[in-house]
């Protein structure tokens, strides 16, 4: 009995020693630690800027600042403006053209802002190499697009005035360069026609077939006669649009008073009345009196195409008293591009 108790005590003592040993060993391993250090590296490549393929816009304004044309890559030509239905965007000397485009840089928009970086719009004669542009238009960036939610993209724009002497159809290219000299190359974005030619053709339609207009004849008249029709009625003015870009025009007429040959009699130009009866393929009813040596507006805008021709009748009120004899003056028609 005593031996069994001693054996039991020995076993318990041994177990306690093992447990304590484990505890001590565990404590010893916990405070015995080691570690290693090193460096992480990466090289970020400088990537070329990217011209957003759907961001190009162009706005044309007259000398007076009136917006007459707008194109957006995303929506096309803005309707309802004077030149919205032109076959090609066109602008005249002194008018303002504003170009817009979004450019991105994967390395961050700051690469597009510092010295040496930039965006240019290039006007190149249609079909020719962009490496030899006629006009280089440097763009600035819209500061409101810097530091916004998109930290890689800026909107660039350039305001340009059409110079005197510029003529023809030009392709519009964009070239973007970052501060390291990496560039997009030449990206074609659109076209514009500068200073398209204006042309009118005036005919008289009193014959079986239209004939070239050579003047107005009111025949034999008496003092006091009113609304005497010209034998050339109907006079037709055609917008022939020589460059085929869809130019619209304003049509003016100027006349001189008719004076008596070898005498002092005069029939004022103001006594001649123009009756507009058709324009842009629609019936019209509009009257205006001519003025001596003054360009009087007959109609605007007149669209191109034979069916859109302006048709006008002319009548004369003969003053009284008026000496007998032959009277003569002149009449001229003008077209002004719109």
Curated annotation (Swiss-Prot):
Topology in the membrane? Multi-pass membrane protein
Segments spanning the bilayer are: 11-31, 249-269, 318-338
UniProt keywords (A-Z) are:
Cell membrane, Membrane, Transmembrane, Transmembrane helix
Q: Is the Membrane keyword given for this protein?
A: yes
* GO CC field: plasma membrane
- Compartmental location: Cell membrane
**From which domain of life does this come?**
Archaea
| Name by which UniProt lists this protein | Uncharacterized protein MJ0289
Organism source for this protein?
Methanocaldococcus jannaschii (strain ATCC 43067 / DSM 2661 / JAL-1 / JCM 10045 / NBRC 100440)
């Amino acid at each position: 009995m005593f031996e069994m108790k001693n054996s039991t005590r020995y076993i318990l003592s041994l177990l306690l020693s093992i447990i304590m040993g484990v505890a001590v060993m565990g404590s010893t391993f916990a405070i015995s630690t080691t570690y290693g250090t090193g460096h992480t590296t990466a090289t970020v490549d400088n990537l070329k800027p990217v011209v957003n393929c759907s961001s190009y816009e162009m706005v044309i304004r007259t000398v007076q600042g009136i917006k007459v044309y707008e194109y957006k890559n995303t929506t096309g030509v803005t309707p309802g403006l004077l030149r919205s239905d032109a076959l090609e965007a066109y602008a005249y000397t002194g008018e303002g053209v504003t170009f817009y485009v979004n450019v991105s840089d994967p390395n961050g928009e700051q690469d597009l802002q510092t010295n040496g970086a930039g965006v240019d719009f290039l006007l190149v004669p249609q079909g020719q190499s962009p490496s030899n542009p006629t006009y280089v238009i440097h763009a600035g960036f819209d500061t409101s697009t810097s530091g916004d939610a998109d930290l890689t993209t800026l909107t660039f724009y350039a305001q340009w005035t059409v110079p005197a002497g510029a003529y023809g159809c030009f392709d519009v290219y964009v070239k973007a360069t970052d501060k390291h000299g990496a560039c997009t190359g030449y990206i074609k974005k659109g076209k514009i026609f500068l200073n398209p030619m204006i042309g009118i053709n005036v005919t008289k339609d009193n014959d079986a077939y239209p004939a070239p207009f050579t003047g107005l004849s009111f025949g034999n008249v008496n003092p006091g006669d009113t609304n005497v029709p010209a034998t050339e009625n109907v006079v037709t003015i055609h917008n022939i649009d020589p460059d085929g870009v869809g130019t619209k025009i304003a049509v003016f007429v100027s006349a001189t008073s008719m004076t008596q040959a070898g005498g002092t009699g005069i029939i004022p130009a103001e006594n001649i009345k123009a009756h507009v009866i058709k324009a842009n393929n629609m019936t019209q009813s509009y009257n205006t009196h001519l003025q001596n040596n003054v360009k009087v507006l007959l109609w605007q805008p007149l669209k191109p195409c034979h069916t859109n021709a302006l048709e006008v009748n002319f009548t004369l009120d003969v003053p009284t008293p008026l000496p007998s004899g032959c009277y003569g003056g002149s009449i001229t028609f003008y077209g002004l591009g719109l």
